């Protein structure tokens, strides 16, 4: 058995926003993404109840987007690197979500509490070659697991690099345009400095109508977030 050291859980005060999170914090964009993934056709974005824990950052991480629709709770996370520990991270996060949604006193009630069913999805656009879609399970972390695990949590990861999941990209135009923007940044970075690569990608996408309105309104912030994100994964 591996010896473990106890570590104090602290908030990650250096958490930085990402272009993905900012883009899909818009209810219309988020609903479009949800519809594309689930094969639905909702038009009223107010059906989305946003429950992202804005002020709670646990274990050095923060979930990007959390929302409830049709009594289901969805946790969306964007990742630029492969991370097999997402099930464990989401376990901590969903526990915090349920604590927020449930009155503690009702835990001692004789009436069964009803909870929104959780769904965990990661959107991956790292440079490492990965399949279009895969699933990680919490039980993969267990040592000496025998038989069916008594606690399981499954995270589905969807590859959103431009040449992957093309049908999904077509069904959610904003996601497809986001993939084009990221690809353009990386293409530019092969022949110029990262700062120049990002700025030129933003200008070119605006000219071509790729995320044009979003980039015009948030140009400076998008440039800063993109540079920080790409630099972190060089």
What is each model feature region?
Residues 1-234:
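Elongated, amphipathic alpha-helical interaction scaffolds
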């Amino acid at each position: 058995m591996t010896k473990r050291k106890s570590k104090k859980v602290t908030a990650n005060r250096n958490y930085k926003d990402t272009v993905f999170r900012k883009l899909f914090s818009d209810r219309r964009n988020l609903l479009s993404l949800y519809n594309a993934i689930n094969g639905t056709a909702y038009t009223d974005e107010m059906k989305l109840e946003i429950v992202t824990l804005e002020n709670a950052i646990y274990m050095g991480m923060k979930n990007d987007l959390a929302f409830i629709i049709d009594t289901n709770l969805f946790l969306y996370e964007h990742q630029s690197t492969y991370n097999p520990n997402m099930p464990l991270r989401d376990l901590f996060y969903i526990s915090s979500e349920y604590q927020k949604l449930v009155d503690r006193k009702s835990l001692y009630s004789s009436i069964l509490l009803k909870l929104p069913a959780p769904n965990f999805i990661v959107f991956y656009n790292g440079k490492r070659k990965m399949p279009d879609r895969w699933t990680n399970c919490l039980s993969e972390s267990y040592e000496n697991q025998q038989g069916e695990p008594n606690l399981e949590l499954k995270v589905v990861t969807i590859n959103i690099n431009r040449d992957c999941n093309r049908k999904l990209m077509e069904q959610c135009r904003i996601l497809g345009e986001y993939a084009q923007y990221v690809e353009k940044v990386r293409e530019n970075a092969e022949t110029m400095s990262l700062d120049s690569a990002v700025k030129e990608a933003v200008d070119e996408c605006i000219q071509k109508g790729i995320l044009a309105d979003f980039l015009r309104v948030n140009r400076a912030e998008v440039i800063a977030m993109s540079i920080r994100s790409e630099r972190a994964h060089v």
